[in-house]
A protein has these predicted regions:
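Amphipathic alpha-helical assembly segments used for oligomerization, scaffolding, or translocation
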Residues: 1-181
Length: 181
């Protein structure tokens, strides 16, 4: 009674408690129905939100018991892929992030990819620009400029495949210069 009196400012009654319980069950049922409707149309982002809201109302309510394991699994995999995208972006693995993003877009018709796509494209372009500047510095014999631009490219996108290409070219150049000696 202290919870109701201090928190809500009213004395609990059987009718009030019954009304609150019925409202919670109605809300959970409505959210589960919304979840299933979104799932039917492959709107996984919205479906995951409705399912989360339904669980927040009450995990053990009867309406939530109607959600099958297969339906929960679809949402779990969607959330895991979303988390994998965030992790790939955090470690600046933009090639992997791009693959995960494409997978999410194919799986969910309501996934908003614009922010992630913009960030991936920008960071890839910045890294590639630094690589291009490094190559220009190398052509002009500016070793310090080459090293600085390569460092910048690596900081922006450490797994840029063009960095491997530069390493291969440098190895070939070094091998050829050793043969000439």
């Amino acid at each position: 009674t202290k919870f109701f009196t201090e928190g809500l400012g009213v004395e609990p009654t059987v009718t009030g408690l019954d009304s609150a319980a019925n409202e919670a069950m109605r809300k959970a049922k409505s959210l589960v129905q919304g979840f299933k409707n979104h799932l039917e149309y492959n709107e996984l982002h919205s479906a995951s939100k409705r399912l989360t809201e339904a669980y927040a109302v009450g995990e053990f309510l009867p309406a939530l018991q109607t959600v099958s394991t297969a339906e929960r699994r679809i949402i779990l995999e969607y959330i895991r892929n979303g988390n994998a995208l965030i992790k790939a972006m955090d470690v600046r693995d933009y090639a992997q992030a791009k693959n995960i993003l494409e997978s999410l877009k194919k799986r969910s018709s309501d996934f908003d990819s614009t922010k992630a796509e913009g960030a991936i494209a920008a960071f890839m372009r910045i890294s590639n620009g630094h690589i291009r500047a490094a190559q220009m510095a190398m052509v002009n014999g500016d070793q310090a400029g080459f090293q600085e631009e390569l460092k910048q490219a690596t900081q922006v996108w450490p797994t840029n495949p063009k960095l491997d290409e530069i390493d291969e070219r440098l190895d070939l150049l070094l091998d050829n210069s050793n043969l000439a000696k």
